[in-house]
Amino acid sequence: MGKVAVVTGAAGGMGRAIVARLLADGHAVVGFDVDEGGLAEMAQDGFAGMVVDLMEATAIKEAFAEIEGMLGGVDVLVNNAGTCFMSEFPDIPVDEFERQMTLNFSAAFHCCQAAIKLMAGRDGVRKIVNISSNGAYNFDVFDPPHYRASKAALDNLTKDLARRFASDKIAVNSIAPAMTETPLFGVLSEDVLAKAVAQMPHGRAMQPAEIADWVGFLVSPAGDISSGNVIILNQGRDVR
């Protein structure tokens, strides 16, 4: 059997592509999501879906305890879960700000806490891949400030943990994609979406499977020597 991988937001568009890639590479994959029906649709050998509310730190802790009992530990964590609320500053409601930061940053923080403990003593270089966003760096696009802040915080966590656990052979990287065709497109108006896609040099949005291929690379032995990096995927849009 391959490595044990945990993927958050597994039932979403990006999550399904990442799960498919890791399964194809021979890993046992545990997928977290609140979408029980979506997880059920993904049932196949090597995949275990767990209904986990990532807004609750206690639920995250309990889920990893269950994984420890079931599979003995964790080799790979992909923090993929996230959302983008579109309220404009300064009229962002407090609860929306808190939900944005909790799902995009705090959930990943708590998953890292739990996963790193279960990575101790495992063979080889263990991996954490955080799915960030090009929006944390490109201020010419439409992303609202609480979304940018949540993803920038995630990338700082990536760098801190990469340095902190380098000698423990835990490699931590972020992937920061630009426009990728997922259900989150639904939060955008037609004109905003059309303008954003038109800005992409290839004239199209990227596909979840393309991002998943980068996750697969970082998780593979070829990615062992990469840690502390924020890998920006945007077709060269923001080269200066």
PLM feature segments, named:
Residues K117, K159, R163-S167, D224:
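Alpha-helical segment proximal to the catalytic Tyr-Lys
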Residues E88-F89, P93-M101, F185, A196:
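Substrate-binding pocket helix/loop in short-chain dehydrogenase/reductase
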Residues C112, S150, T158:
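Active-site helix of classical SDR
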Residues G2-V29:
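Canonical Rossmann dinucleotide-binding motif of NAD(H)/NADP(H)-dependent dehydrogenases/reductases
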